[in-house]
From Swiss-Prot:
This is Cytochrome c oxidase subunit 2. The gene is COX2. Binds a dinuclear copper A center per subunit. Component of the cytochrome c oxidase, the last enzyme in the mitochondrial electron transport chain which drives oxidative phosphorylation. The respiratory chain contains 3 multisubunit complexes succinate dehydrogenase (complex II, CII), ubiquinol-cytochrome c oxidoreductase (cytochrome b-c1 complex, complex III, CIII) and cytochrome c oxidase (complex IV, CIV), that cooperate to transfer electrons derived from NADH and succinate to molecular oxygen, creating an electrochemical gradient over the inner membrane that drives transmembrane transport and the ATP synthase. It is found in: Mitochondrion inner membrane. GO terms for molecular function: copper ion binding; cytochrome-c oxidase activity. GO terms for cellular component: mitochondrial inner membrane. NCBIfam families: CoxB (TIGR02866). Its cofactor is Cu cation. PROSITE patterns: COX2, COX2_CUA, COX2_TM. InterPro entries: CcO_II, CcO_II-like_C, CcO_II_C, Copper_CuA, Cupredoxin, Cyt_c_oxidase_su2, Cyt_c_oxidase_su2_TM_dom, Cyt_c_oxidase_su2_TM_sf.
Length: 248
């Protein structure tokens, strides 16, 4: 347990006080989201500098003379600049954004499927590709561990009694739904945030590229115990995953 906590802190895979940036990415989708964010912030800084310069220039020029504005009737060049420049910036930001949106939304040839169902106020998981000894689909419920029952190294409001186990370097499809109200299945390090709506099956995928323990939470206000719906995913080698499946 202490080893897991140490690795999570080293890799920034858990929420931390006063955090100002993303958790470390563990999937290509999350890596793309972080890269898009950094690029957009860079373009916004350029636009901010340009607008600030224009405001400063105008305020200093017209501050020198109360009648200076009378001698400027047209400014076709500046009008062209303030029309063309924002349009080009928007196109530069829009194309990578749309590409990433469609890539994250596309689920192609997954190796396995995990179904997550949100309920007030816990999660229910189903491994539809695997059967237990009785010939039934492997499924279990996951509840938050109360604060007074936490052991050393476990995280308050994040640890659960039964975590999702996934194999590393495997294309996994997550099918998300709800049995009552709208929930949201959110895993920051994996770049997953998808609504769990009753009567609807939403899907997304993840290729988790490193082992570790990842935490998420329900990110849709779903009732008085909304904060008591954490998500915990343990990513292990394929051999360990198969051993875990055999034990279910």
């Amino acid at each position: 347990m202490m080893k897991e906590l140490l690795m999570n802190n080293m890799l920034n895979d858990v929420p931390t006080p006063w955090a100002m940036y993303f958790q470390d990415s563990a999937t290509p989708n999350m890596e793309g989201i972080m890269e898009l964010h950094n690029n957009v912030v860079f373009y916004l800084i350029i636009m901010l500098c340009f607008v600030t310069y224009m405001l400063y220039n105008i305020s200093t020029v017209y501050n020198k003379s109360a009648v200076a504005y009378k001698y400027m009737n047209h400014g076709q060049f500046i009008e062209m600049v303030w029309t063309t420049f924002p349009a080009v910036m928007l196109l530069i930001m829009a194309f990578p954004s749309f590409m990433l949106l469609y890539i994250c939304d596309e689920v192609m040839a997954p190796a396995m499927t995990i179904k997550a169902m949100g309920l007030q106020w816990y999660w229910k998981y189903e491994y539809s590709d695997f059967m237990d000894e009785k010939g039934e689909t492997i499924e279990f419920e996951s509840y938050i561990i109360p604060e007074d029952l936490l052991e050393d190294g476990q995280l308050r409001m994040l640890d659960v009694d039964a975590s999702v186990v996934c194999p590393v370097d495997t294309h996994i499809r997550f099918i998300v739904t709800s049995a009552d109200v709208i929930h949201d299945f959110c895993m920051p390090s994996l770049g997953i945030k998808i609504d769990a709506a009753p009567g609807r099956l939403n899907q997304t995928s993840a290729l988790i590229q490193r082992e570790g323990v990842y935490y998420g939470q329900c990110s849709e206000l779903c009732g008085v115990m909304h904060s008591a719906m954490p998500i915990k995913i343990e990513v292990v080698p394929t051999a360990d995953f198969l051993t875990w499946i055999d034990e279910q």
